[in-house]
C-alpha cells in the first residue's frame, strides 16, 4: 500500500518509537536475566530491527504489514539489501526463542542488540534521505524517559 507524505512521516515516527521502545525493553529484560526474560529479549531485539526497517519503508511511502511483504521490500529495494542477512539472523534467533523454546544466555541478547545497532547504522543513512527529520525524532525519543 502506498502512503501520502503526511501518513509516511507519521509512519516513520510511529516505527521509530517502536524501535526505541523495543531496544529499551530488550535491555530491561537482559538486566532481569531470567531465562524467559532472555528469550523475550531477543524477540524484542528482532522487533526493534523490524521497526527501523519499516520506518524506512514508511519514508519511501510503502506500508509493509507482514513479514512476507517485508521480504518483498528487501528484494525490491536493493539499497537496503545489505540489512537482510542481519535482519534474517535476528528473525531466526527470535523464532528459536519463541517457537522452539531455545534457551538464551545474556551473550545471545547482547549479540542481538549489536545486530540491531548494525541494522540501525545501515538503515539510518538511507532513511534520512527520505525523512530528514528521522534523526531528530530518534534523538528526541532517546532523550525522553519511556515507561
Regions picked out by a protein language model, each given a short descriptive name:
Residues 1-147:
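Terminal alpha-helical segments
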